[in-house]
Swiss-Prot record:
Record protein name field: Ribosome-recycling factor
Predominant place of localization: cytoplasm
UniProt keyword Coiled coil present: no
The organism's taxonomic lineage, starting at the top: Bacteria, Bacillati, Actinomycetota, Actinomycetes, Mycobacteriales
Protein family: Belongs to the RRF family.
A Pfam family the protein falls into: RRF
InterPro entries: Ribosome_recyc_fac, Ribosome_recyc_fac_dom, RRF_sf
Source organism per UniProt: Mycolicibacterium paratuberculosis (strain ATCC BAA-968 / K-10)
Biological process, per Gene Ontology: translational termination
One GO term describing the cellular component: cytoplasm
Keywords: Cytoplasm, Protein biosynthesis
Domain of life of the source: Bacteria
Compartment(s) where it occurs, according to its Swiss-Prot or TrEMBL record: Cytoplasm
Keyword Cytoplasm appears in the UniProt entry: yes
């Protein structure tokens, strides 16, 4: 019962870190990155579909992304979706390809994006702490119901705290890495 609660909590914490990693990857740095388009969706035959499923995305140069839609009829829709996104880029369309030049970030925009990264990291840490709190409640319930002894639950609580600290540290490292990427000129 205790092992199950700890395993469940660790699994959820792992997912929270994965979500944080995905969220941070969508924040644009000064370099071209295919991941920056993962959240952009277009209406494809009535279904909201991510651009990543409708086109191949390549990065031939550090500041250039080339998007080649699988269907030529989708070029205009993809271009419009990118232009209307919050990426701050201006795509050009040559009929079959979309080229996106990634402009240099201004110092002010870099600071803004660092704040955004820290905010996403903080959200992830709150999520991990909530998972810990729920697992602690489960451990207290196990103790109260007499399913496990005081010592076992105490050890499990220490393990849970250690695991929580480990995942919070991972999130801090992700944010620190992203901050370094953003502030690098």
């Amino acid at each position: 019962m205790i092992d199950e609660a700890l395993f469940d909590a660790e699994e959820k914490m792992e997912k929270a870190v994965a979500v944080a990693r995905d969220d941070l990857s969508t924040i644009r740095t000064g370099r071209a990155n295919p991941g920056m388009f993962s959240r952009i969706v277009i209406d494809y035959y009535g279904a909201a579909t991510p651009i990543t499923q409708l086109a191949s995305i390549n990065v031939p140069e550090a500041r250039l992304v080339v998007i080649k839609p699988y269907e030529a009829s989708q070029v205009g829709a993809i271009e419009t979706a990118i232009r209307n996104s919050d990426l701050g880029v201006n795509p050009t369309n040559d009929g079959t390809l979309i080229r996106v030049a990634v402009p240099q970030l201004t110092e002010e925009r870099r600071r803004e994006l660092v704040k955004q990264a820290k905010s996403k990291g903080e959200d992830a840490k709150v999520s991990v702490r909530n998972i810990r709190r729920k697992a602690m409640e489960e451990l207290h319930r196990i103790r109260k119901d007499g399913e496990a002894g005081e010592d076992e639950v105490g050890r499990a609580e220490k393990d849970l705290d250690k695991t929580t600290h480990q995942y919070i540290t991972q999130i801090d490292e992700l944010v620190k890495h992203k901050e370094g990427e953003l502030l690098e000129v």
